[in-house]
Amino acid sequence: MGEPATDWRQERRSGLGAIAVSLVVSITLWLALCRLMPPLIGMDKLSARMAVALKCLAVATLFTLVAGVEAVAHERFQTSAFDPLEGHQTKRLRVNLRFLQNTLEQIVIFAAGLFGTAFYLSSGEAMRAVPATTTVWILNRFAFWAGYHRSSAMRGLGVAGMAISLIMLLYVTARVGHDIAGVPGTIILVGLYLALEAVLFLKTR
């Protein structure tokens, strides 16, 4: 009984290292993109900001979700896994299926955060964050995918993608709270989420 626990803890330590690398690289890249990218034109209009968010989401969908669908389809077509009902699955196919499912979940969160962030960013300089964030998110999806093919721990290389979506949603939630009740509204809404997160964390210990 002791051996699996030891292996699990070793995997977790490796995963934490991968997460640290992911966060450092992602933050550095995001800051560089925001600094080097020229300001977007015409961002004083809400419709223009929503259009930018929609374009970014379309690109992200193509390079992540559609890529995952294609990977699974090609694997089905060219291997003994052709008939899903037969249950023949290679390790590569199982990883691709996990990537596809995870990306489907993550892209919903990302989209909500992206459009919400674009709603509140009212200048061309600030709106550089939208394509910069999209670029970093896409790269994190690929890092998750490639890392997962190496080991379960190495999928942590893409964890910054989830952090990006969460940060955007927290920013939007804070702004919504401020719109409703000023600073107290922000504190209440963000505080409620953090309390929920704490409960979920404690329940799994």
Where are these regions (language model features)?
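Small-residue-rich segments of transmembrane alpha-helices in multi-pass membrane proteins
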Residues: 24-26, 91, 157-172
